[in-house]
Amino acid sequence: MKILNNYLYKHVLVILCFAFFAQLFYFPSLSGKKLLQSDIVQYSGMSRQIKEYRAENGQKETYWIDNAFGGMPTYQLGAKYPADFLGFIHDLFRLLPRPSYILFLYLFSSYVLFLVLPVDWRTAIFGSFAFGLSTYLLIILQVGHNTKAIALAYMPLAVAGFLLLINKKWLKGFIVSVLGLGLNIRANHYQMSYYLLFILVLLALFYFIDAYKNKSLKVFLKSIGLFSVSGLLSLGLNATPLLATSEYSKFSTRNGSELELNLDGTKKIKSNGLDYDYITEYSYGIFESLSLIIPRIQGGGSRENLGSDSELYEFLVKKGISKSQSRDFTSSVPTYWGSQPILEAPAYIGIVVFLFAFFAAIILKGPLRNALVTASILSLLLSWGKNLPFITDFFIFNIPLYNKFRAVSSVQVILELCIPILAVLGLEKILSEPNKYFKAFFKPAIILLFMLISLLFLKLIGAFSFKSPIDSRLLEAYGDQILQQIIYAREIVFKEDIIRGIILISLACFIFSLFKFKRIKKNIALVLFFGITIYDLGGVAFRYLDWNRFVNKSKIESPFRITNADKTILNDKTRYRVYEPQLSLTGARTAYFHNSIGGYHGAKPRRFQELYQFFNYNELPEILNILNVKYVLYDSEEGLSPLINEEAQGNAWIVDSIIKVNSADDVLKTLKTIDLKKHAIIEDQDAANALTIEKNIDYQSKIQLIEESVNTLKYSFNSNSKQVVVFSEMYYPNGWEAKIDGIIVPHYRVNYVLRALKVPSGEHIISFQFSPKVVEFGTNIRYVSISLFTIILLIFMFGKRLKSNFK
């Protein structure tokens, strides 16, 4: 018992230190400030109606909003669902403020994994920081990719569960697997969960090969079987968001378009996922991949802070530019000369960490090493995207779901987990058997030093141009002299980081030599290795972390400044939409104050985006009219000004005729040629034959909106004959129910994105209610999964005892 208490005390102390470090790392939060994250600012605009609905309805949930893209489900906007067992577990970690609690999760989750490997707890601490302080993981927190960060934080826990089961730790392995997989999926960033699957599949493959060779397939199959059960339960515990997202994805930009033609009339390349160019837009350059270990090999981030001690600053001051202007310019220098459109920071994993991992890859054998090395190489190759088309194309066109995700460069998260695992295994070897591995350790060190020195030599002979694809714009903006200084600055940071790498590798070799020849003890060696790793990773991360982004709480709660134009529009209490052309579909400022046709989302409603692109390309104001855009916010000398659109067609209108067409392309073609006040267009696939118009048109017919909320709309209708009514609301069949006088009736898609309804003569109340059945169905699966998880735990805990009692 005393040994157990000491064991627990040690780990509890480590975990408390992680929490203290995470809070101290983001020290501005200690004074009550909060991190202003750009993506979360946009999310605030998108989620406004969700928060308002919860506040007004006793924290009840709406699964539909009107304030963005004309209306869309909230499934990918932080929707809360019933029976969220895993949410309770996740909330335990949220005792710390954001982003500190996510940094703590990085450290805690990876610490659990490293203890499972197993390695000494002190080496596990080293590994936790090697993983948690990698630049990419910290930068995604700064810009607000919180769901991605949380999903990444739980990745090590899922791998730990797999390894526990492989090592026949059945109960621990089962619990950790369910929690690790479940919490990773619950984070709601399925791209990261998909990449986790890559790691797990490779682990399973190499452990299967090993089990087959060693004739231990029975134990392996038991481990994989239990892990599969864990996986199914983790899916079940996340059934509602998974099913809802799957349902919505068919209508989102993540699914293939129904259009056969591009806007210019050329043939569209068909895909059941995202467009090829969109998927591969952010592809890592092959040479640029060296930034994993040399951060500014291609200039670092798109904007580097070179500081007032830089040669560029001195040049600007000598040219007569004021010191304050020179400081401003050198705080944001376009040193990046890679091919990606924009780069917040290089995905630096640490040259010392890589040295240990490289060493481990050379000297280790076995399925774990093989899986980690293979996963790392595969993720690197895939991150090259369009720069390595034969592999990228194979995955896009042949591997299920791969074409549902963009930014292939982010697949490097796989190696950002695998490399620290290898590094920990390598460090454990040299600390436990220094004499055995002394010579072996110097082989990768010499290779890395040779590579770094070779890069310096290549620079010396002019092998690198240091020219960027954006230099023509920089030349136009700043002139040739300043451009040449920027290019020179790229050369300087290139050289500085290579020399920095040489020094760090030399220090690591020196520390190991001191330890091997017994000049220092093991604990001192570990502390020194830890110190240079923290210096290495922290030094690079701090180049890009901006503490000025921590602001007062009031700024977070009101991230957008209301303008006089917004106030004027808000005086209108009718139902309408607002369009801000400057933002297009890339900003949620308008959605924060109004019902907007714009917004900010990675999975926009596909047909709405296509209609907007069609409107923009053809400059058809009639499209704004049928979307009930009553106000257009345009830039003027006084700021934003509201322009009233007198032609907006309102909430609903009665049409004279229905035009039937064969395809989605035909709908868009026809939209250009007809009067949309009188006619509506329906596709054959949308039950065109069911939506017909009587010859007797009653021009005295009336329809009026009488009640509205985000998920309920009611209209009064009066006509002497049957009519077809078009509503300026987005058509989404899964969840929206149309009723006439309380009786459910079918409604149809017209004009590419809108709803239409056939209404009999007389006075009627028409209503639309959003009640998605997928939420109810998913909730039932969740309850079943919670029950099964509990039953299996009870069997594990009491099964052996019951079995022995009945003998």
Place the predicted regions along the sequence by residue.
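Extracytoplasmic
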Residues: S257, L261-K267, G531, Y535-Y699
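Transmembrane-helix motifs of polytopic, lipid-linked glycan transferases
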Residues: Y101-P118, V353-F356, L422, C509
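Polar, glycine-rich mid-to-C-terminal structural blocks
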Residues: K222-Y284
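Contiguous transmembrane helix-bundle modules in multi-pass membrane proteins
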Residues: G144-A153, L165-G182, Y190-F227, G231, ...
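Transmembrane-helix signature of polytopic, membrane-embedded enzymes
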Residues: F114-L133, K168-F174
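Active-site-proximal, structured, solvent-exposed surfaces of multi-pass membrane proteins
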Residues: K630, K678, I682-K807
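Transmembrane signal-anchor helices characteristic of membrane glycosylation enzymes that use polyprenol
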Residues: H11-R48, S230-A244, L378-L382, S454-L456, ...
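Membrane-interface coil-to-helix junctions
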Residues: A19-S110, F129-L152, K267-I351, L382-T392, ...
